[in-house]
Regions:
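Membrane-cytosol interface segments of multi-pass membrane proteins
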Residues: 1-160, 199-200
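Aromatic-anchored, glycine/proline-accented short structural segments
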Residues: 173-202
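Membrane-interface helix caps and helix-loop-helix hairpins in membrane proteins
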Residues: 115-120, 164-175
């Protein structure tokens, strides 16, 4: 069965990819360390704005994943389609950096790549994403079983815990894995209970 391509989501994906590239360019270039807030320049402001959307892009990608995956099942093929490219590029760049002298080769780095779920989960996106993917079958069962009201209450509790308490109560409640699962469930809610705009008038 063919799936209808949604051009608006494709465009959004492209914009988010560019946002992630911009974020890594600014953050990993070392330029932020040269910024002086005593002498704010146009270049400084431009780079700050240009590189500020990396986390937003991660949230958007997770939201889209929840939107499309909540009604489907995570198969081994789908999981490996995500997992294997991550490992391939991780190994490739590790060897390239070692060969070019950018980094020193270490078997510890290889070990960390193999067991990234242990070393990177809740720290780096790739490791956390793999953990979230493994939780998708369970989140889907939960999302489909809850009533609309129960689903809303669950999201309210999660959002209060991860955002309100840390923002207004100064509590360190944020957790990267938990947050990605929350955003996934928000995407699933949007898919299961879409906003009907047919009768809305401007």
């Amino acid at each position: 069965m063919e799936h209808k391509r949604e051009s608006n989501l494709e465009l959004l994906r492209i914009l988010m990819i560019l946002s992630i590239i911009g974020h890594h360019f600014v953050v990993n270039s070392g330029l932020p360390q040269l910024f002086s807030f005593d002498n704010i320049t146009f270049n400084m402001v431009f780079l700050q704005v240009f590189g500020m959307w990396g986390k937003t892009a991660i949230n958007v990608f997770t939201l889209i994943t929840g939107y499309f995956m909540v009604k489907s099942d995570l198969t081994l093929k789908k999981f490996l389609k995500l997992y294997l490219p991550i490992k391939f590029w991780s190994f490739l760049f590790t060897f390239i950096f070692a060969i070019t002298g950018y980094t020193i080769f270490s078997f510890k780095d290889i070990w960390k790549i193999i067991f990234s779920m242990i070393y990177e989960a809740d720290v780096y996106y790739a490791g956390t994403l793999i953990v979230m993917m493994l939780l998708i079958p369970f989140m889907n069962v939960l999302a489909r079983a809850l009533s609309k009201r129960q689903y809303q209450l669950m999201l309210a509790v999660l959002l209060i815990y991860f955002t309100f308490l840390s923002t207004f109560m100064m509590r360190d409640t944020f957790d990267f894995t938990g947050w990605l699962c929350t955003v996934y469930l928000i995407g699933g809610y949007i898919r299961l209970y879409p906003l009907k705009v047919d009768n809305l008038k401007c």
